[in-house]
Amino acid sequence: MRKDWCEARKNDPTPTQMYYAKNGVITPEMEYVAKVEMLKPEYIRQLVAEGKLIIPANINHTNQIPMAIGRAVKCKINANIGSSALASDINEEIEKLKVCLKYGADTVMDLSTGGDLDEIRRAIIANSTVPIGTVPIYQIIHDIKDLDNLTPQIMLECIEKQAKQGVSYFTIHAGFLLKFMPLVAKRKMGIVSRGGSLMASWMMKHHKENPFYEAFDEICDICAKYDASLSLGDSLRPGCLHDASDEAQMSELAVLGELTKRAWEKNVQVMVEGPGHVPFNQIEFNMKEEKRLCHDAPFYILGPLPTDIGAGYDHITSAIGGTMAAFHGASMLCYVTPKEHLGLPNAKDVRDGIISHKIAAHAADIALGRVGAIERDHAMSDARYKFDWNKQFELALDPDKARELHDESLPQDVFKEAEFCSMCGPKFCAYKISQEIAKIECSDYPKEKK
């Protein structure tokens, strides 16, 4: 879709959406986003220029359909896929990607840590019409084998290689500073971020500052070259309710706010990552603190999970917290699957995670009065009242699941025309009774005696 657009500006010195926006240019990507979100193109340009909205769109991912992340547009959801050292199958990852696209993931992150990472990533980008994000430290550690071998040069080479492939955003753990280590010691669960734990290990062994922080300007230069956005990772996100909103988390968040401004100076788009495990009554506070400390950059959050005991059902736990977070300003929800805390998700887990978080994001969009958000719900209400079963399946966030559950008890085609379902049957259907009542003429009512 974007091949001609990207070709036309391939020789521009800074081909980023933010650069064009700051210079008054409305790109085709901005126009497309404006149409999808039912907003004015100039408004989209202004938000991108201010850093309040990002359009993650690497110039080398030309089959990607433009989308936007920010408070002014509908809440988005991300789905994670990727191999592990114990389970690496490129075909399975492509199947997971297909599930992500089918059920409406707005972005996908390849978090592979095992197998041929370059080939897995190449295949995912080639088959994806949504932005692909990565966490470069995973490949860095995979390639160098030993964390002690990490150098800034190796780090930058890996990021550029992935940017050349078409990665549209990078999670960079640059806000975790050496001076925060004593704060981590006060926690019940320490560091639960994989990238954060690797950086902590490196800093403690070498007694040096975080190399991602030290090389942040060079990382921004690479991102500006390919219009890859930065997703500033929260290495110190709370992994349990006990650690939520603590000094470690907030100290890192303040640094992420500083890094956001530095990236903007280089015309690099930024979103900020957030928690994590957070009690329900602290979610609003966390959203407002990010807005304050990070200058209203889009907030991309994992959950948050308002309880620690939902193992096996954490896609539900996360969706509960995610709805509240999105209502108070989160711009994108990273899905959590039923396998969270338990193992590597399969395609079914991916589907369940996506749908639960699509529900959460959509509920927040309705509550916030976002343009067009409630229209699908109104259409569903009409279809239900008219017993239009096929239309109901079509309008559902998961049409396959809706049809499957209906057909468990009434599989024959004749029941797609029936004015009842298996719950109430033909005699106790409230919709049917209500429709019969509505047919009664007013003249049929007893007249009031004077």
Curated annotation (Swiss-Prot):
In the record, biological process GO terms are: thiamine biosynthetic process; thiamine diphosphate biosynthetic process
- Its Gene Ontology molecular function terms? 4 iron, 4 sulfur cluster binding; carbon-carbon lyase activity; zinc ion binding
**This protein's record includes keyword Translocase:** no
Q: Which positions are annotated as binding [4Fe-4S] cluster? A: C421, C424, C429
Write down how the cofactor binds this protein: Binds 1 [4Fe-4S] cluster per subunit. The cluster is coordinated with 3 cysteines and an exchangeable S-adenosyl-L-methionine.
Q: Which InterPro entries match?
A: ThiC, ThiC/Bza_core_dom, ThiC/BzaA/B
Its GO CC terms? cytosol
Q: Which residues bind Zn(2+)?
A: H277, H341
Question: What Pfam families does its record include?
Answer: ThiC_Rad_SAM
Question: Could you tell me which cysteines form disulfide bridges?
Answer: none
Q: What UniProt keywords are attached to this protein's entry?
A: 4Fe-4S, Iron, Iron-sulfur, Lyase, Metal-binding, S-adenosyl-L-methionine, Thiamine biosynthesis, Zinc
The record's comment on protein family reads:
Belongs to the ThiC family.
- Protein known as: Phosphomethylpyrimidine synthase
Q: Which organism is it from?
A: Campylobacter fetus subsp. fetus (strain 82-40)
